[in-house]
């Protein structure tokens, strides 16, 4: 199942309930609805797919799920793209003594180390088809055989995979196994790029500056209006990761972005930015008050008729969140 691009709503596994909707994913201060979703799914023994561009916080989200899961085992994070294909099988499944020349000592692989914990496979889209078939067998049998061995080793683990490319598209292209996709895809969460969440850019930038200043033991530099406009107009291809680096550069007294001022300025105009911020604030307020428009209007200090008008104009979802 997958996130639908309708206010970023999704229809989850039956045991999660009827319907949950949310408007954005915020890595530092997670949006109320996504936070509720994570708290719901974290304790459940279901596998997850995280889809999003580089730097959108997939690793951060996987670690948060592990912290909230209550499982006794570790989170074993594996970057599938960083392991040479010739070593991938031994790294994942482990080896027995004498399995190949130079294998003088038996050792467990990443899958075995994830027993009673979570195996996080980042960039799963780079895994060779031959290894995908073996991973599917592990998920079906919940156990492994080390390379060069015949003994079945039971493994009780949960799997979270992350990808920059939509897995269903890769299935259609023939580069990802359809059966593995359906086995993994109990629930899919799509993390939004920073350019579609302009309302969090400045708060996150300030947050990262404060952290950098604490580490460097210096006073956080002031953010000018001109810099704010520049940050909001930038397209952020590196997403949160690039924003964090920009904050560190700015704290050091360097230009925050190592690009010409006339480059990559493809972000939304100020009017659109303000519209998104207002929509986000109204949505968050509705969520806090269980979608009670009366209570939201009181908190916002806004006449009820005006709030109704803004909800309709901005197309703010008012559907009750059910978990």
From Swiss-Prot:
Residues binding ATP, per UniProt: 52-59, 123-132
Segments forming domain Sigma-54 factor interaction: 41-251
Keywords noted in UniProt: Activator, ATP-binding, DNA-binding, Hypersensitive response elicitation, Nucleotide-binding, Transcription, Transcription regulation, Two-component regulatory system
InterPro entries: AAA+_ATPase, Homeodomain-like_sf, HTH_Fis, P-loop_NTPase, Sigma_54_int, Sigma_54_int_dom_ATP-bd_1, Sigma_54_int_dom_ATP-bd_2, Sigma_54_int_dom_CS
CDD domains from the UniProt entry: AAA
GO BP field: phosphorelay signal transduction system; regulation of DNA-templated transcription; symbiont-mediated perturbation of host programmed cell death
Originating species: Pantoea stewartii subsp. stewartii
Protein name listed in UniProt: Pathogenicity locus probable regulatory protein WtsA
Top-level division of the source organism's lineage: Bacteria
Transmembrane segments: none
DNA-binding region: 293-312
Keyword Thylakoid attributed: no
Gene Ontology MF terms in the entry: ATP binding; ATP hydrolysis activity; sequence-specific DNA binding
């Amino acid at each position: 199942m997958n996130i639908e691009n309708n206010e970023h709503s999704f229809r989850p596994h039956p045991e999660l309930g009827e319907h949950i909707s949310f408007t954005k994913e915020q890595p530092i201060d997670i949006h109320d609805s996504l936070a509720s979703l994570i708290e719901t799914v974290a304790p459940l023994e279901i596998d997850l797919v995280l889809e999003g561009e580089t730097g959108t916080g997939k690793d951060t989200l996987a670690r948060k799920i592990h912290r909230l899961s209550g499982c006794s085992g570790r989170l074993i994070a594996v970057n599938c793209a960083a392991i040479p294909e010739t070593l991938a099988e031994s790294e994942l499944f482990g080896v027995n003594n004498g399995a190949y020349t130079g294998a003088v000592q038996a050792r467990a692989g990443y899958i075995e180390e994830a027993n009673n914990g979570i195996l996080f496979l980042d960039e799963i889209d780079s895994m060779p088809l031959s290894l995908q078939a073996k991973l599917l067998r592990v998920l079906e049998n919940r156990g492994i055989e080390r390379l060069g061995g015949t003994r079945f080793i039971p493994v009780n683990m949960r799997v979270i995979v992350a990808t920059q490319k939509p897995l269903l598209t890769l299935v259609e292209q023939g580069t990802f196994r359809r059966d593995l996709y359906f086995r993994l895809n109990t629930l899919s969460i799509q993390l939004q790029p920073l350019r579609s969440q302009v309302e969090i850019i400045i708060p996150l930038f300030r947050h990262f500056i404060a952290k950098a200043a604490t580490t460097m033991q210096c006073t956080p530099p002031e953010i000018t209006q001109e810099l704010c406009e520049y940050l909001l107009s930038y397209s952020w291809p590196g997403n949160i990761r690039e924003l964090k680096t920009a904050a560190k550069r700015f704290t050091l007294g360097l230009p925050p972005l190592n690009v010409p001022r006339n480059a990559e300025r493809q972000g939304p105009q100020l009017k659109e930015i303000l519209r998104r911020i207002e929509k986000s604030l109204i949505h968050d307020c509705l969520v806090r008050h269980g979608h009670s428009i009366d209570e939201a209007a009181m908190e916002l200090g806004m006449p009820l008729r005006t709030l109704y008008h803004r909800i309709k104009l901005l197309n703010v979802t008012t559907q009750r969140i059910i978990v």
